UniProtKB/Swiss-Prot annotation:
A single cellular component GO annotation: nematocyst
Protein name, as recorded: Cationic protein C1
Note: Does not have hemolytic activity, phospholipase A2 activity and acute toxicity in crabs and mice.
Keywords annotated in UniProt: Nematocyst, Secreted
Cellular compartments annotated: Secreted; Nematocyst
Primary location: secreted
Signal sequence coordinates: none
Superkingdom of the organism of origin: Eukaryota
Amino acid sequence: GLRDFNVAVRASNGKYWTRRPESGTLV
């Protein structure tokens, strides 16, 4: 979904856990 896409983008920037750790899909 769109959320997963945004998560992927944030993860690539290393700010995934900083923004939304509860969605922990990639990590």
